[in-house]
UniProtKB/Swiss-Prot annotation:
Belongs to the bacterial ribosomal protein bL12 family. This is Large ribosomal subunit protein bL12. The keyword Ribosomal protein applies. SUPFAM superfamilies: ClpS-like (SSF54736), Ribosomal protein L7/12, oligomerisation (N-terminal) domain (SSF48300). InterPro entries: Ribosomal_bL12, Ribosomal_bL12_C, Ribosomal_bL12_C/ClpS-like, Ribosomal_bL12_oligo, Ribosomal_bL12_oligo_N_sf. The keyword Translocase does not apply. The gene is rplL.
């Protein structure tokens, strides 16, 4: 009988959580490995390196400032949101763009700051 991936997946889907746990334990014992996620073993210096290597940033609107209409227009241009959604975002604050490259995040911040908003890049 040939190995059939679809049948194997169907068999896994039919198993209970307890049966899956026992299967994982048996596989760990058989192959001499663990399924636990590796914990960061690096010293405190490793955290500093990770912060320096950050390539994606979130652009967060803190407040609209005095010129709310201009900020709403910029938010609409940047995000492509409708008028109501952009207004709600400007009124409540929040993430304008997630996981943006550094250059793009800074450009968005400059545009919104020029419109009068208070923006933070995280």
């Amino acid at each position: 009988m040939a190995f059939n991936k679809e049948q194997f997946i169907a068999d896994l889907e039919a198993m209970t959580v307890l049966e899956l746990k026992e299967l994982v334990s048996a596989l760990e014992e058989h192959f001499g490995v663990t399924a636990a996620a590796p914990v960061a073993v690096a010293a405190a210096g490793g955290a500093t390196e990770a912060a320096e290597e950050k390539t994606e940033f979130d652009v967060v609107l803190k407040s609209a400032g005095g010129n709310k209409i201009a900020v709403i227009k910029e938010v609409r241009a940047i995000t492509g949101l409708g008028l109501k959604e952009a207004k709600d975002l400007v009124d409540n604050g929040g993430v304008i763009k997630e996981a943006a490259p550094k250059d793009e995040a800074n450009a968005i911040k400059e545009k919104l700051t020029a419109a009068g908003a208070e923006v933070e890049v995280k």
